Structures are given as structure tokens and as C-alpha cells.
């Protein structure tokens, strides 16, 4: 684990002391090396799949998320260059330092060996993200979005802190492996339902579950490109990772507590998918689509079957790659047309034909075209939900149809139709942008060929 963490920490002095003309090149090249090195964690050597020491461990659940975090850092750095073009060198350094410090916190969170350490790092990720949104966002509403993001996440996670202190007092330890391997770790009492709610609330807000999702579209729409990418790909997955870790400990005592939340998650998927159909703002549409996909992950995690766990883990990785690609594509349009309104940026297929190909591939991946990893994860979740209740098949089937409709609606709105007059003077695309798209799509294609790498601990 340290072979990834220490080089990432060393990015901080590299960014601080590089000359201004070498700063982007050094940080991009070095972070690409780190992401290549992180691929080694996918190869679990021991029988249990645990690379373990006293502070950090990786297993088949955390490894894919670690690799995803490392993989997206160079892409975020490359994607931000145009956005920061007119900023001073000091501000550029500050931006990159915030991104790298966020990356360090995420790497430590996904490999934390104790729940309290995970909680502290979970909260630490708030600070750099908030600064990135509030300082480098696009519109003045960014301060409002930052406040929503901060208070939703903070208020949701305070009960978790109380629950962890209570569990520490009862069990004497918050070690993830120890609690996972202990049969029935928590005593059965009337307060267990409250304990379950306290533990889950932080993660359900972070996912976010429908009903607690109001902070997400605001944060996504106002964040700069790197903020949107890290938020969609990794910060939402902190919630899913937390649920998958803690649900095993809470499992025997409060199985009934999960039922209303499974129903809310499946209903929320339909609602947010329907909201996508009437969006005019491109980034807002992609943000609501994230809420819909995360509803699938919540439902699959709470059903607690091996297929559900595998589907949830695969969906988190597939969604991380697909939604960041869509946000990056939306940003290429925004950089040229200075608008996110889909009516104003239609007909771009004529001007940017290669970018149109990336739009097509990203939209098809988002709707779960066979044989992509998105479809594999969706099928696993549908099977596990069907085993829980036959009626969920209606809701999940309807959600799949609506997802296909809004993905194609997004594609046709942006790429087809009559061009607007201000689209005629659009700048051509850069090789850098095409490389970012290729590096999003390449893992999706490779994981389609070998999905067992990201199916998690239940495989």
C-alpha cells in the first residue's frame, strides 16, 4: 500500500518546487506513473486476498477503488489545464496541491484498517473538495453549492461518530477485519435499530440516496471539471464502500431496517431517471443520472447477497469511469460554447466529428449496452433484487428503459439537430482531450473482458 501512498505524497513537493513551465508536465507524468504502479494491487497474492499491515490493508473490495482513484488523478490534472489557463502560477500550484491532498486522503480512506480512521479520513476529504468548488467553480452559486455539500455531509455523518464510539465501548475494537470475522459482534437490544440508522445515515447521504440527494446536482453543476470528476468517480464511492464494510457487522441484528431503504432506493431510481428526462442543463442531467445509478448500488448493498455485493462493487467502478467521461465531454462543450444549456450547444457533430464518436460511446456505456461492464453489474443487481422480491423487476426494468431514453436524449440533443449561429466559430479539439477520453474508455473495455478484477470480496 505504501508503494502507492508515498509517491502520491511526494507529488506535493514536486508541484511546489517545479518551474511554472514544467509544473503541468511533471505532475501529469508522475501521476501517470503512480496510476500504472497502482495496477499491481489488483493482483492479490495471498489466499485471503489481503495485503495487510497494522495501519493499511487492501482486499478485493478496496483494490479496485484504489486503482480508480489513482487512474483518475492524471486525467483530472490533464482536464484542468484549460480551466486554469488565466490563473496565476500560485493559484495553479494551490489547485494541484488540493487535488493531490484529496487523493492522499482518499487512498488512506480506502485502505484504512479501522472504522474510526476511515471516519476521520472520510471527513478530511470534505475540506479540499469544498475549497475546489468554492474557489474555482464557474458561477456565483458555487458558495451555496459548497454550503449544501458541507452541511449535508457533516450532519449526516455526526450520528456515525456516536455509533462508532458506542461500538468501541461495547466491543473494545473498531478493527474492520476483527469485527467482520466475529460472529454476531453486537448484542441484540432495542437500541440496535437506532444504531443501524446512525451507522447508515452518513453513507446514504454520501451516496446519495434519493431524498438526501439535493446537494449533489448543485455541487456537480457549480464545481470545476476536476471537482466534478472526483466527486462523481470517487467521493460518492466512499459511501458505497462504507455501506459494504459496515453492513456485514450490523447484519444479523437489524435486517428489517434495510427494507424501507431498499424500497426508497428503487423508487428513487425511477424518480431521478424521470427528472433526467426534463433537464435542460447538461451537467445537471449527468448529476441526476449519478443519483439513479447510486440507487442501484444502495439497493444491491442492502439486500446483502453475494450477487448483490458483486454487482454493487462492479457498478461503482463502471459508473466512476462512465460518469467522469460524460462530465469531461460536457466540459469540452462548455469550454467552447460557454454554456451548459443543451438547446444552445446542439448540432456539434458537424463541427467536432471525433468528439461525437466519444459522446456516442460514453452514452452507450451509460445506458448499459451489452457487453459493457455497466450491463454486467446491472444484471447482477437485478438478479439479486429479484431474489429478494419479484416486484422489484418491474421497477428495475422500467429504470433500465428510462436510462436508455435519457442517455439517447442527451446524445441527440448535443450532437444532432440544426447548429446554432455561435457554434460556427467553435475551436477544434486538442489531442489532450482525445487522450483523456481514450483513457476513460480503455479500462471500461478491458474490464468487460475480465470483470472478475472488480467483483469484490464476494467473488
Swiss-Prot record:
Keyword Membrane annotated: yes
Catalytic activity from the UniProt record: a ubiquinone + NADH + 5 H(+)(in) = a ubiquinol + NAD(+) + 4 H(+)(out)
GO BP: any one term: electron transport coupled proton transport
Residue runs in coiled coils: none
EC number: 7.1.1.2
Chief place where the protein resides: mitochondrion
Record's signal peptide: none
Pfam families (UniProt xref): Oxidored_q5_N, Proton_antipo_M
Keyword entries, A-Z: Electron transport, Membrane, Mitochondrion, NAD, Respiratory chain, Translocase, Transmembrane, Transmembrane helix, Transport, Ubiquinone
Membrane spanning residue stretches: 22-42, 65-85, 96-116, 117-137, 146-166, 194-214, 230-250, 256-276, 284-303, 308-330, 350-370, 391-411, 435-455
InterPro entries per the UniProt record, alphabetical: NADH4_N, NADH_Q_OxRdtase_chainM/4, NADH_UbQ_OxRdtase, ND/Mrp_TM
GO molecular function terms noted in the UniProt entry: NADH dehydrogenase (ubiquinone) activity; ubiquinone binding
A GO cellular component entry from the record: mitochondrial membrane
Keyword Electron transport carried by entry: yes
Superkingdom of the source species: Eukaryota
Membrane topology: Multi-pass membrane protein
Localization per record: Mitochondrion membrane
NCBIfam families assigned: NDH_I_M
Similarity field: Belongs to the complex I subunit 4 family.
Function as written in the Swiss-Prot or TrEMBL entry: Core subunit of the mitochondrial membrane respiratory chain NADH dehydrogenase (Complex I) that is believed to belong to the minimal assembly required for catalysis. Complex I functions in the transfer of electrons from NADH to the respiratory chain. The immediate electron acceptor for the enzyme is believed to be ubiquinone.
PANTHER family named in the record: NADH-UBIQUINONE OXIDOREDUCTASE CHAIN 4 (PTHR43507:SF20)
Protein name as catalogued: NADH-ubiquinone oxidoreductase chain 4
Amino acid at each position: 500500500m505504501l508503494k502507492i501512498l508515498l509517491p502520491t505524497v511526494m507529488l506535493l513537493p514536486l508541484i511546489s518546487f517545479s518551474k511554472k513551465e514544467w509544473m503541468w508536465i511533471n505532475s501529469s507524468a508522475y501521476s501517470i506513473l503512480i496510476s500504472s504502479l497502482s495496477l499491481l494491487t489488483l493482483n492479490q497474492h495471498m489466499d485471503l486476498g489481503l495485503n495487510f499491515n497494522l495501519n493499511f490493508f487492501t482486499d478485493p473490495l478496496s483494490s479496485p477503488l484504489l486503482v480508480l482513484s489513482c487512474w483518475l488523478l492524471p486525467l483530472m490534472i490533464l482536464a484542468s489545464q484549460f480551466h486554469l489557463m488565466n490563473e496565476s502560477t500560485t493559484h495553479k500550484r494551490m489547485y494541484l496541491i488540493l487535488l493531490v491532498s484529496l487523493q492522499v486522503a482518499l487512498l488512506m480512506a480506502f485502505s484504512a484498517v479501522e472504522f474510526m480512521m476511515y471516519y476521520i479520513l472520510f471527513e478530511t476529504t470534505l475540506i479540499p473538495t469544498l475549497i475546489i468548488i468554492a474557489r474555482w467553480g464557474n458561477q456565483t452559486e458555487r458558495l451555496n453549492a459548497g454550503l449544501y455539500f458541507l452541511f449535508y455531509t457533516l450532519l449526516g455523518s455526526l450520528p456515525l461518530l456516536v455509533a462508532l464510539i458506542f461500538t468501541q465501548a461495547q466491543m473494545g475494537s473498531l478493527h474492520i477485519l476483527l469485527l467482520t470475522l466475529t460472529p454476531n459482534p453486537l448484542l441484540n437490544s432495542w437500541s440496535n435499530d437506532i444504531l443501524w440508522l446512525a451507522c447508515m445515515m452518513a453513507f446514504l447521504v454520501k451516496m446519495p440516496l434519493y431524498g438526501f440527494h439535493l446537494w449533489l446536482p448543485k455541487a456537480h453543476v457549480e464545481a470545476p471539471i476536476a471537482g466534478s470528476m472526483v466527486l462523481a468517480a470517487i467521493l460518492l464511492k466512499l459511501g458505497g464502500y462504507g455501506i459494504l464494510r459496515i453492513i456485514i457487522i450490523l447484519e444479523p441484528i437489524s435486517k428489517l431496517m434495510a427494507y424501507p431503504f431498499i424500497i426508497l432506493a428503487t423508487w428513487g431510481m425511477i424518480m431521478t431517471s424521470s427528472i433526467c428526462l426534463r433537464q435542460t442543463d447538461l451537467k445537471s442531467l449527468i448529476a441526476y443520472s449519478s443519483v439513479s445509478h447510486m440507487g442501484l448500488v444502495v439497493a444491491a448493498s442492502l439486500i446483502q447477497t453475494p450477487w448483490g455485493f458483486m454487482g454493487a462493487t462492479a457498478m461503482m467502478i463502471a459508473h466512476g469511469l462512465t460518469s467522469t467521461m460524460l462530465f469531461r465531454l460536457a466540459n469540452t462543450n462548455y469550454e467552447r460554447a460557454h454554456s451548459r444549456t443543451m438547446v444552445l450547444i446542439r448540432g456539434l457533430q458537424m463541427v467536432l466529428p471525433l468528439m461525437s464518436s466519444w459522446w456516442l460511446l460514453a452514452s452507450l456505456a451509460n445506458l448499459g449496452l451489452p457487453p459493457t461492464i455497466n450491463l454486467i453489474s446491472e444484471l447482477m443487481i437485478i438478479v439479486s433484487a429479484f431474489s429478494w422480491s419479484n416486484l422489484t423487476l418491474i421497477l428495475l426494468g422500467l429504470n433500465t428503459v428510462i436510462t436508455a431514453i435519457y442517455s439517447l436524449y442527451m446524445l441527440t440533443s448535443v450532437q444532432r439537430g440544426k447548429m446554432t449561429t455561435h457554434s460556427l466559430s467553435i475551436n477544434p479539439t486538442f489531442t489532450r482531450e482525445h487522450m483523456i477520453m481514450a483513457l476513460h474508455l480503455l479500462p471500461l473495455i478491458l474490464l468487460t473482458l475480465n470483470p472478475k478484477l472488480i467483483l469484490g470480496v464476494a467473488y
